[in-house]
């Protein structure tokens, strides 16, 4: 039994979500191989070979794989699938784009968002916005799985010594072409990788107040900024700051929720955080039910005082 992890990378380095997915693959009990499909991605393949627990790295190199087009990556995975019992993808935007294509082409049922490996064919995954855990079993010979990265600790990025094997690149499917990419530059940590997150809700009242109140606290803590869906929908924060079931799933060491009531959809995206601090003037706010520390106070007074204390 051998599992293949489809690495997420930028052709130069391996993304953190891959490390969590390797941990999930290792829990299956067999060998773990990693596929690095890209262009001029030798550095990423070398980095994958250093990941603890990886037995082999497969490196497919072609111009058609340079930008991670889902159709071409799926074709590459399909070309290798017969040699593996499990195909694992991080449950990121990229992984969720490729995995269903692979499952459909293999005519198997995808197992999505797993948070625990029970056995080689049985897994746990959250349902109903995380309010229940489903145990699912797959009878397919090849199991296509997406891994909720917050459910598994990352594998060590160093300490491994896997061999890197070049494999033939699949032909360009030709169904899509890469047009361009707009990358947002920020001095703050990336939201899903941040160790500390300061999030704001609709109670902040405006984009100006959102930034005025929360930015000093985030600066003091070296934190990423997040937001509830209500705050994003109101225009207080950009879409890529949204935390929740329809946003980003996070599990930082510290999550500070200011003016967030705690709708079930938001809780689904952050309740695995190690320490949760909630600031809200409503004592009945649902956010207090998951908070480790709760401060019943007006955030416009409490947050500046907290900044001063830090």
Range-by-range predicted roles:
Residues 1-310:
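N-terminal glycine-rich FAD/FM-binding segment characteristic of electron-transfer flavoproteins
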């Amino acid at each position: 039994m051998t599992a293949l992890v489809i690495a997420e990378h930028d052709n130069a380095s391996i993304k953190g979500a891959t490390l969590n997915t390797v941990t999930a693959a290792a829990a299956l009990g067999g060998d773990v191989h990693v596929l690095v499909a890209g262009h001029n991605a030798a550095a990423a393949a070398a980095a994958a070979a250093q990941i603890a627990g990886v037995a082999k790295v497969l490196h497919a190199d072609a111009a058609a794989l340079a930008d991670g087009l889902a159709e071409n990556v799926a074709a590459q995975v399909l070309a290798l699938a017969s040699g593996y019992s499990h195909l694992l993808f991080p449950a990121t935007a990229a992984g969720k784009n490729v995995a269903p294509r692979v499952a459909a082409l293999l005519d198997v049922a995808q197992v999505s968002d797993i948070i625990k490996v029970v056995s080689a064919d049985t897994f746990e995954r959250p349902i109903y916005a995380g309010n229940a855990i489903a145990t699912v079993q797959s009878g397919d010979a090849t199991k296509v799985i997406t891994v909720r990265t917050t459910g598994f600790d990352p594998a060590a990025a160093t300490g491994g010594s896997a061999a890197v094997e070049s494999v033939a690149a699949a032909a360009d499917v030709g169904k899509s072409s890469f047009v361009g990419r707009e990358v947002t530059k920020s001095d703050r940590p990336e939201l899903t990788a941040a160790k500390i997150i300061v999030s704001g809700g609709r109670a902040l009242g405006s984009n100006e107040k959102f930034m005025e109140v929360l930015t000093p606290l985030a600066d003091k803590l070296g934190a990423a900024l997040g937001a509830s869906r209500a705050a994003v929908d109101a225009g207080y924060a950009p879409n890529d700051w949204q935390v929740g079931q329809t946003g980003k799933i996070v599990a930082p060491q510290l999550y500070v929720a200011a003016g967030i009531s705690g709708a079930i959809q938001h809780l689904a995206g952050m309740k695995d955080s190690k320490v949760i601090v909630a600031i809200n003037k409503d004592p009945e706010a649902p956010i207090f039910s998951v908070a480790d520390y709760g401060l019943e106070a007006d955030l416009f007074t409490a947050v500046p005082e907290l900044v001063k204390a830090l």
